[in-house]
């Protein structure tokens, strides 16, 4: 089971949780292998080029399957032709947070402040082309505001920038900011999901603040090499759906601020297409490239 990100990353955590259960149910031990690099492209290419026999799977986020096809001019794999979706395993919203350098305690108040002083505030991200970058850029476009992007290398660095005052805003995974929110060091202004998150029910959606069409949930999905026999894919899908309903799995996912999904391959393919459609105009307009 290839994870195109490092040990301890969210895809890695989800992969190991599912891997343990899948190994038990199938009576065949899967081994999680981390292959990070190039925004997830290295590991995803390894899945795409693997023998399609059901013995090599991948757990990845949307990026290597959607946005990376736009951010990188030359990929060594074609996700549309070489990757078979199995199911989205889990999802989490991104959370827009602010430090005490920003006036206003609600998203509408923040928007008023941003419009009053265009370019005054900046936001930290986990890196160029990351969902934390693209989501905030889309918020700026949809709300008609001007927010300066400052890229960092990880969610931890992005949070550190908020706490030090180098940045005032960010759009980050709940796990990265919930501790600082509870401590009163950061304010949660909105989530990027279509509906309020069960994990943060008191935090409104962007739509509630009048900003439409900025769904930017981060999801983790299981894939296989294209050409894997349909009966194998169907069996894997059935097992995954059953695993994601286990109380202990739901509890462990909730503990890391994830919500289980377990949808169909067709629904996962639709999610990839939706992400591609959402990010393509933004990436092209602002000439965002990682080459």
Regions found by a protein language model. Name each.
Residues 10, 14, 18, 43, ...:
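Stable alpha-helical elements in mature extracytoplasmic
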Residues 64-74, 138-142, 169-203:
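A ligand-binding cleft/hinge motif common to bilobed small-molecule-binding domains
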